[in-house]
């Protein structure tokens, strides 16, 4: 895209999270103030393209846009359901009928996979910014929304711990993460969990019960905190006998059945509170840097890339590479897994590996957090 007046589209797709409005703010500010472009906000992502629903976004109309800095959710709305590819021709036509010169999507890995196909088929000038509280988008260390979600869960764990200790109860706290356990792992360590269960490392009810017994024998503690990602699985879970309740309730029921000692259990499913609220400082910084960079890429005529955060700075990576490697799982051999084990946290039936200095490690994937 040249520096002459162009029309840039932006939308948010997938589940909402803190920092979306902050990213929109950065895109609008840089595109309008630095390049003099027109920015259209597409309402409800691809549904807005189908229905040709868009609103003009500019600093004047948004009151200087300062209000967006700390506003949760998304002013553009979002969707995370529907048969988008089944309406591919309508979606693609919407891009052109709205007169877009380029489109920036703030999205997670599922939406990115679909949008990449649409962009290729429709020959769009397309760019992406990663957002997800699961932090499972590949080739980026952080996605917008993750840091705030971790802090939200940690605050909840702090509150639950005090009531658990007061009544000598074991709390099973279920957090989001169907395929990746980043949120459970980060918040569990920071929030003082005794047990962290994630999809990447199978657990056993026997291992959980033994750890709870160890807490009583070693410290005399009657209470405990179990953080479980919603996609966690047992060592030999029978796929032919699916659960008919939440993973948190399932684990609590199994502990009650198999524990050799009497345990008073409670289950807390944090649910959508993890998606809400004002973004924390890190998410605001990510959103600002990623939004600015996406606009600069459009100005340079560089498309088909996702803005990412690697080693403390904003970089760009091919969307095709991101899609091929999604979702980004927790590495069972990572530093944080070893840290949790070193703190005495049960993270599944996995032995603790010896420490390896990451600066001496040749395989960055294994050594990375």
From Swiss-Prot:
Might you give the EC number(s) for this enzyme? Answer: 2.7.1.11
| InterPro entries for the chain | ATP_PFK, ATP_PFK_prok-type, Phosphofructokinase_CS, Phosphofructokinase_dom, Phosphofructokinase_III, PKF_sf
One GO term in the molecular function aspect is: metal ion binding
Q: Where does substrate bind?
A: 132-134, 169, 176-178, 230, 266, 272-275
| One term under GO cellular component | 6-phosphofructokinase complex
Q: Which GO terms describe its biological process?
A: canonical glycolysis; fructose 1,6-bisphosphate metabolic process; fructose 6-phosphate metabolic process
Indicate the enzyme's highest-level EC class: transferase
Q: Where is this chain's protein located in or outside the cell?
A: Cytoplasm
Q: Where is the active site?
A: 134 (proton acceptor)
Instruction: Please indicate if the UniProt record lists ATP-binding as a keyword.
Output: yes
Q: Kindly list the cofactors needed.
A: Mg(2+)
| Metabolic or biological pathway | Carbohydrate degradation; glycolysis; D-glyceraldehyde 3-phosphate and glycerone phosphate from D-glucose: step 3/4
Q: Where is this site: Important for substrate specificity?
A: 110
Binding-site list for ATP: 15, 81-82, 108-111
* Binding of Mg(2+), residues: 109
The record lists the catalysed reaction(s) as: beta-D-fructose 6-phosphate + ATP = beta-D-fructose 1,6-bisphosphate + ADP + H(+)
Where does it primarily localize? Answer: cytoplasm
Keyword entries, A-Z: ATP-binding, Cytoplasm, Glycolysis, Kinase, Magnesium, Metal-binding, Nucleotide-binding, Transferase
Keyword Magnesium belongs to the record: yes
Q: Which NCBIfam families match?
A: PRK03202.1
Q: Which family does it belong to?
A: Belongs to the phosphofructokinase type A (PFKA) family. Mixed-substrate PFK group III subfamily.
Q: How is this protein organized at the quaternary level?
A: Homodimer or homotetramer.
Q: What does this protein do?
A: Catalyzes the phosphorylation of D-fructose 6-phosphate to fructose 1,6-bisphosphate by ATP, the first committing step of glycolysis.
What is this protein's record name?
Answer: ATP-dependent 6-phosphofructokinase
Organism this protein belongs to:
Thermosynechococcus vestitus (strain NIES-2133 / IAM M-273 / BP-1)
